[in-house]
Amino acid sequence: MNSFRFTKMHGLGNSYIYVNQFEEQLPEERLAEIAVKVSSIHTGIGSDGMILICPSEKAPVKMRIFNNDGSEGKNCGNGLRCVAKYAYEHKLTEETSFFIETLSGLVKADITEDNGIVREVAVDMGEPRLTKKELPMLGNEDERTIDETFVFGETELSGTAVSMGNPHIVFPVADINQAPLTTLGPVIEKDPRFPEGVNVEFVETVSADELHFRVWERGSGITQACGTGACAAAVASVLNGVSERNRDITVHLAGGDLVINWQDNGHVLMTGPAETVCSGVYYL
């Protein structure tokens, strides 16, 4: 294979290169290598990673995520919205409500479309996993990490750990513009307490229904948005008594806004946009 077709899409600036594996069938042994190449802003297309849209025996499509360092991720909220948009607009499904298979399980997407163009996607992200075993995180397997003190060098932070199919640690800050994202993000991501690494979020509370958010993503670094991270931030806000269940929480990310609702049934609903940037042919 010397080339393949791609579509670049983004959810609030969190951009990926999307490849339709129904048609292209990139070789398994080269996926990590290709993800690194296409993600490069200098020698590739430029993105936070690569997402494959694959056939599934359980749903209309399956999503596989590769970070820009070549590692494979389990879940991506912004990616899910873009996959839902792609699947509907490219006739991989004719339904406006359908499931997407991920490494974390089946996820339901509901789209809002106008003349065949998807304008907004609501994704049922399922129930948050909160125990150390589910994250995973070292320590007592059945314990939760809520408002726990963490010390990184000379910096002390209070963190809440949440998995949305991938691990997150959420730290409240007084001023989001002063969050130590570049200095502590890469340190916390690889903290040995998180054996699979962790996504790092800093959150400033505006009100019970409004949060400012910045993220250092595992395997990708600073990104404009992280859907699962926004979900984790909203869940952490509820767990710490700041927000309430079954209420819309607007999360302001660097790339735009998501609306998160931790419903009474235990599931987290994420609603936001998905955009197509361009499409073309990439030469290996």
From Swiss-Prot:
**Positions with a binding annotation for substrate:** 14, 67, 77-78, 166, 199, 217-218, 227-228
What GO molecular function annotations does the UniProt record carry, in alphabetical order? diaminopimelate epimerase activity
Q: List the disulfide bonds.
A: none
Broadest EC class?
isomerase
* Annotated metabolic or biological route of this protein: Amino-acid biosynthesis; L-lysine biosynthesis via DAP pathway; DL-2,6-diaminopimelate from LL-2,6-diaminopimelate: step 1/1
The record's listing under Gene3D superfamilies reads: Diaminopimelate Epimerase, Chain A, domain 1
The GO cellular component terms are: cytosol
Q: Where in the cell is it found?
A: Cytoplasm
Q: How does it assemble?
A: Homodimer.
* Role of this protein: Catalyzes the stereoinversion of LL-2,6-diaminopimelate (L,L-DAP) to meso-diaminopimelate (meso-DAP), a precursor of L-lysine and an essential component of the bacterial peptidoglycan.
| Protein family membership | Belongs to the diaminopimelate epimerase family.
Q: In its UniProt entry, what is this protein called?
A: Diaminopimelate epimerase
- Which organism is this entry from? Bacillus velezensis (strain DSM 23117 / BGSC 10A6 / LMG 26770 / FZB42) (Bacillus amyloliquefaciens subsp. plantarum)
Q: Which gene encodes it?
A: dapF
